[in-house]
């Protein structure tokens, strides 16, 4: 079920403040470190880089216009799929 339109997109307040500060700092601001995977990417985030925590390490996410409306966590995968085990019978 989608979020109701009248509520607007969810963004953690501390993340919004950090993004505004980074916009004011300009190009000299580094990536914004965040644990808030649940925050929606809004147009003010375009051009910024976030380090999003995936449960083990921080994954750099550079925000582009196509990402607006998605969640930050969508771009920092939490699971690693190493592939299926090789077929032992076929190796003979």
UniProtKB/Swiss-Prot annotation:
One of its GO terms (biological process) is ribosomal small subunit assembly. The keyword Nuclease does not apply. Pfam families: Ribosomal_S19 (PF00203). Disulfide bonds: none annotated. InterPro entries: Ribosomal_uS19, Ribosomal_uS19_bac-type, Ribosomal_uS19_CS, Ribosomal_uS19_SF. SUPFAM superfamilies: Ribosomal protein S19 (SSF54570). One of its GO terms (molecular function) is structural constituent of ribosome. One of its GO terms (cellular component) is cytoplasm. Keywords: Ribonucleoprotein, Ribosomal protein, RNA-binding, rRNA-binding. Protein S19 forms a complex with S13 that binds strongly to the 16S ribosomal RNA. Belongs to the universal ribosomal protein uS19 family. NCBIfam families: rpsS_bact. This is Small ribosomal subunit protein uS19. It comes from Novosphingobium aromaticivorans (strain ATCC 700278 / DSM 12444 / CCUG 56034 / CIP 105152 / NBRC 16084 / F199). The lineage of its organism: Bacteria, Pseudomonadati, Pseudomonadota, Alphaproteobacteria, Sphingomonadales. The gene is rpsS.
């Amino acid at each position: 079920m989608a979020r109701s339109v009248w509520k607007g997109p969810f963004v953690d307040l501390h993340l919004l403040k950090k993004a505004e500060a980074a916009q004011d700092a300009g190009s000299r601001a580094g990536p914004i470190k965040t644990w808030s995977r649940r925050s929606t990417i809004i147009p003010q985030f375009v051009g910024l880089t976030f380090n999003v925590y995936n449960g083990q390490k921080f994954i750099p996410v550079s925000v582009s216009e196509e990402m607006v409306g998605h969640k930050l966590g969508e771009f920092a995968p939490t699971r690693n799929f190493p592939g299926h085990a090789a077929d032992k019978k076929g190796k003979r």
